[in-house]
Amino acid sequence: MPLKLTTYYHGKDIPELPGKNTFHSKELFLIYEATPGYTPLLIVATEDGRPVARLLAAIRKAKKWLPSSLVKHCVVYSEGEFLDESLSTNKEKAEEVFGDMLEHLTQEASRSCVLIEFRNLNNSMFGYRVFRTNDYFPVNWLRVRNSLHSMEKTEDRFSPSRMRQIKKGLKNGAKVEEAHTVEE
């Protein structure tokens, strides 16, 4: 039987679903729904009436000088949650299901968003082909965090390749800031 995709816009409409991933849960959907400036949407893939995967996206408004209709941003954490155990072992089928959900999300979110961003992908190569098919592109991002208990010779802790990456980043406009509080 073909895959059926259902999009939920309101928490009261979402049925109880199996799964343990907090980033694609009904609970997080309800939190986004109650938060001003956020509009969540949950895509659930079902096969033969049983849920096999889900993907939660949050559309947020940025409070900038531009009109809010121009600066809506859709964020998805990881590649979704696969509820069917057979998808965990069959990567090709998992990518096919993810590709269908990604295409559906792209159609839904591109109506109101300028940017759709996937963060914290578990495997950077998972779904690469379907991302490219849907006109997504990778962005190189380097975040370096180190505990600096002793301030002497901090550079000695970095490998030569990490030092090259940092120098290249600084040359290309990256900023280095020292954290003074826990919040930073």
Model segments located where?
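Amide-forming acyltransferase catalytic core, primarily the GNAT-like/NAT-type
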Residues: 1-79
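Acyltransferase donor/substrate-recognition loop-hinge adjacent to the catalytic core
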Residues: 1-9, 130-184
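Hydrophobic, Leu/Ile/Phe/Ala-enriched alpha-helical segments that form helix-helix packing faces
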Residues: 14, 18, 31-32, 101-109, ...
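Short, solvent-exposed polar/charged micro-motifs at secondary-structure junctions
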Residues: 15-16, 126-129, 184
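Sequence-level motif detector for i,i+2 pairs with an aromatic at +2
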Residues: 38-40, 52, 113, 139-143, ...
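A structural signal for short, well-ordered beta-strand segments and their strand-loop junctions
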Residues: 44, 51-56, 114-120, 177-178
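Short, flexible loop/turn elements at secondary-structure junctions
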Residues: 47, 59, 120-122, 148-150, ...
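Acyl-donor binding region in acyl/amide transferases
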Residues: 63-138
